[in-house]
Each structure stands twice: as structure tokens, then as C-alpha cells.
A protein has these predicted regions:
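Anionic-ligand-binding alpha/beta catalytic cores of soluble enzymes and soluble regulatory domains
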Residues: 1-3, 7
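Cytosolic Rossmann-like ligand/nucleotide-binding regulatory domains
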Residues: 9-76
Length: 76
């Protein structure tokens, strides 16, 4: 079975438990953060040590299953 990678956009909730955590906490399970948008400023291929903030927009790349897991974790 061929893996079908795709992109997904996730908006981190304002009061997210993930705010203050580095992107590397998301960049496992086959997920790559391809962009981060904060206050209208887009950063392509952000560094793994970039700290997430509430209302960040993350563009994730990975398989559908990996993206589902990452989105559930981010929206907690």
C-alpha cells in the first residue's frame, strides 16, 4: 500500500495546553511542520525549537493517520 502524504492546517486554540511547547513535540510520528503563521506573519519550515503560542496556525505534512493523531493532540 502506497503512503499518501498530504497537508493539513490546524489552528491552535487560544488556551491550548500545547502553547509554550516546542514544535518538535508535534514533529514526531511522521509529521513535518511546513509552516507556522502567527499574527499574520508566515514562517516557512520553522525550526523544531520554535515555541507554539495560542492561535498559531500550523501547516502539517504527513499521512492521514499521522495527521489525525497530531491534530487530536494539538486541539487538547
Amino acid at each position: 500500500v502506497e503512503r499518501q502524504d498530504r497537508l493539513r492546517t490546524v489552528v491552535l486554540p487560544a488556551q491550548s495546553a500545547n502553547a509554550g511547547q516546542p514544535l518538535q513535540s508535534v514533529m514526531n510520528d511522521g509529521i513535518v511542520v511546513t509552516a507556522l503563521v502567527r499574527e499574520g506573519v508566515r514562517r516557512l519550515n520553522p525550526e523544531a525549537d520554535t515555541v507554539m503560542a495560542g492561535e498559531d496556525i500550523l501547516v502539517l505534512f504527513g499521512s492521514a493517520d499521522d495527521l489525525d493523531r497530531a491534530e487530536r493532540a494539538l486541539l487538547q
